[in-house]
């Protein structure tokens, strides 16, 4: 994928009509093409909390396993959570969780794919966000000061707007 920077002066708001009212974009005439996107985020926590997750010693159980499933489930329900997002048939969703002692915390990366007339970025970022929220929920008994950070779309491909890779 190659990086593409959007020039704010060229940007148009596709989800607003001429009067500025929100509307759902009609993608019916757009060809179905392969679309892929990835997203990432992290949750920072106390080192002791990270150790509890690593040792699977939190009262709610397998934090990473539940967060992975929650992210996948969330991607499938994105159009119910984001008002103007089209429901699309996902062909793939992946949620990876990595324990990071240097953070300290958990880094989440997600990917999603579809063959559709609209992109899959929202599904990737919703998967990442809900995986992080689930980690918070499952570990809050040990650490209420956890902070979710740096949630973003990291890449997308397919569609008329071209490929995008977020700057590192």
Tell what function each PLM region has.
Residues 1-64, 69-86, 91-168:
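C-terminal binding/interaction regions
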């Amino acid at each position: 994928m190659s990086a593409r920077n959007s020039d704010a002066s060229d940007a148009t708001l596709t989800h607003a009509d001429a009067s500025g009212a929100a509307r759902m974009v009609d993608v019916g005439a757009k060809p179905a093409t392969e679309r892929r996107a990835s997203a990432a985020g992290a949750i920072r926590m106390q080192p002791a909390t990270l150790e509890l997750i690593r040792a699977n010693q939190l009262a709610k159980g397998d934090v990473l396993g539940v967060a992975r499933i929650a992210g996948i489930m969330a991607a499938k329900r994105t159009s119910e959570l984001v008002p103007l997002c089209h429901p699309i048939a996902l062909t793939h969703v992946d949620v990876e969780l990595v324990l990071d002692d240097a953070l300290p915390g958990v880094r989440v990366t997600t990917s999603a794919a579809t063959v559709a007339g609209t992109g899959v970025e929202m599904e990737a970022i919703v998967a990442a966000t809900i995986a992080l929220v689930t980690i918070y929920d499952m570990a809050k008994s040990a650490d209420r000061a956890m902070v979710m950070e740096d949630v973003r779309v990291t890449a997308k491909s397919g569609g008329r707007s071209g490929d995008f890779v977020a700057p590192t």
